[in-house]
Amino acid sequence: MKFSLVATIVLLALAQGSFAQGAADLESLGQYFEEMKTKLIQDMTEIIRSQDLANQAQAFVEDKKTQLQPLVAQIQEQMKTVATNVEEQIRPLTANVQAHLQPQIDNFQKQMEAIIKKLTDQTMAIEN
């Protein structure tokens, strides 16, 4: 009877030890799953934040674009007015410059024609 009592105690001790080892494994497995859950939550939160940041940036750009459209239209209108004014001021100046240069251009053309005629006449005289 003592032997069976001792064998039972040893068997209980071994069983308790193996249960303790199983509990430790279970605890480490539970900790691993807890860490995985925490990492997954952090990753998903970061993805949602980055998506939210992209949406905020897009909304900001659209808002500023909407605000700037009237200003751009106003600047374009002012540029058209300035271009018209500059053209009106330059047109008489170009006409004036052309009027001053045209006699000189005509004179230059006559001189070049005279030189070419003289060279042609000299070439004809040499050939004969």
UniProtKB/Swiss-Prot annotation:
Q: Which Gene3D superfamilies does the entry mention?
A: 6.10.250.100
Q: Where in the cell is it found?
A: Secreted
UniProt keyword terms in alphabetical order: Antifreeze protein, Pyrrolidone carboxylic acid, Secreted, Signal
Q: Which residues form the signal peptide?
A: 1-20
Q: Which GO terms describe its cellular component?
A: extracellular region
Q: Which residues carry this modification: Pyrrolidone carboxylic acid?
A: 21
What does the UniProt function comment say about this protein?
Answer: Antifreeze proteins lower the blood freezing point.
The UniProt entry's sequence similarity note says:
Belongs to the apolipoprotein A1/A4/E family.
Q: What is this protein's record name?
A: Type-4 ice-structuring protein LS-12
Species of origin reads: Myoxocephalus octodecemspinosus
